[in-house]
């Protein structure tokens, strides 16, 4: 019976409380069901027909464009003062090393890519 209630609770997106270990009987369990806040807020947030929600303006892209050539300015890097091409740039401002750069030659560990911070690279024309 408890497994049926828990499976229904999972399907409906509800939370349950696991059995309390302070009960004297090891088989006694208690099921507490609380409705999720997101499920209750979803119908209220529905917009009237005919109105499309306005999209938030995108911030300008961070870092160099994909495929552009960059010079490495990190002194301890194997590719210091070398030129590589940008593979990807993480647009999250909290990322420490958002720019992935690929090089033609490999380092001692046979790796040809590395991540760099925005102040450790310089775009080459």
Swiss-Prot record:
Mode of membrane association: Peripheral membrane protein
Short name of one Pfam family: PSI_PsaE
Intracellular or extracellular location(s): Plastid, Chloroplast thylakoid membrane
Domain of life: Eukaryota
Listed Low complexity bias regions: 42-57
PANTHER family found in the cross-reference section: PHOTOSYSTEM I REACTION CENTER SUBUNIT IV A, CHLOROPLASTIC-RELATED (PTHR34549:SF10)
Name of this protein: Photosystem I reaction center subunit IV, chloroplastic
Gene: PSAE-1
């Amino acid at each position: 019976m408890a497994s049926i209630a828990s499976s229904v609770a999972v399907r409906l997106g509800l939370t349950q409380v696991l059995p309390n270990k302070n009960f004297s009987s090891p088989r006694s369990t208690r099921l507490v069901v609380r409705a999720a806040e997101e499920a209750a807020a979803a119908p209220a947030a529905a917009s009237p027909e005919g109105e499309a929600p306005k999209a938030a303006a995108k911030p300008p892209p961070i870092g160099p464009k994909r495929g552009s050539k960059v010079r490495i300015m990190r002194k301890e890097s194997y590719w210091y003062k070398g030129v590589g091409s940008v593979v990807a740039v993480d647009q999250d401002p909290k990322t420490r090393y958002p720019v992935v750069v690929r090089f033609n030659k490999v380092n001692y560990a046979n790796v040809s890519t590395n991540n760099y911070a925005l102040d450790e690279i310089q775009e080459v024309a």
